[in-house]
Amino acid sequence: MLQVQTIPSRQDNYIWLIKQGNQAIVVDPGESAPVIERLRQQSLNLKAIFVTHHHHDHVDGVAELLALYPQCAVYGPQITLTDVPQLQTMRDQDLISFPDLDLTFTVWHTPGHTAEHIVFHGHGALFCGDTLFSGGCGRLFSGTAEQMYHSLQRLASLPEDTLVYPAHEYTYNNLSYCLQAEPDNVFTIKRIKEVSKLRQQGCPTLPSTIGIEKQSNVFLRTHMPSVAVFAQNSSELYLENEIQIFAILREKKNNL
């Protein structure tokens, strides 16, 4: 199992640090200072940076980290960091291997939040940026509802015990919306109580798991009759399929 550490960043971001011996990989460093502090505290060398998409709260720390760790490799989608010569452009199904660390990750292209968004999975963990949140999913910027629906369905196909590491602490608010759609979902009722307690203690609610998300995340539950009814009641048009249901769910969440 991977050793994954949480580095809180900005208002509600998480930078994930994968530790293997004295080497580290960080995911979506939206700022450099907390990463540098953690690396120095634990005498770690920065081996690589994983970037899921181009938004500032995911990439603003990259330049300063590379200045301190010039041998560090960067893996991300093509349009993410056009001014970073170390960037190794990742495409769907690419493999990232670190033989000296005995680590290999698979890249999936998951458009929706942005057109270029990618995720990294391996060793029972999924680093999913702003595609999948605990209880939710990312807003649609340069991607479409259809793309995001298919991206989420693809992530849902991973083993249920896969640990899910999103880039934001949105769980409580997301689950509140899920309960609007499924007020009788016993699992979600229990989950939001656990999440509330964690937040009161100042603890992260992450990682989640694919299994937890399939039982509580309304955006992975468009096949459920109660969710379809909730979406239909929010739409003036007849919803013919799960993609349309998803689109209405996302639009309604945007307006809360």
From Swiss-Prot:
The keyword DNA-binding does not apply. It comes from the Bacteria. Binds 2 Zn(2+) ions per subunit. It catalyses: an S-(2-hydroxyacyl)glutathione + H2O = a 2-hydroxy carboxylate + glutathione + H(+). GO terms for biological process: methylglyoxal catabolic process to D-lactate via S-lactoyl-glutathione. The keyword Cytoplasm does not apply. Its cofactor is Zn(2+). Pathway: Secondary metabolite metabolism; methylglyoxal degradation; (R)-lactate from methylglyoxal: step 2/2. Thiolesterase that catalyzes the hydrolysis of S-D-lactoyl-glutathione to form glutathione and D-lactic acid. This is Hydroxyacylglutathione hydrolase. It comes from Tolumonas auensis (strain DSM 9187 / NBRC 110442 / TA 4).
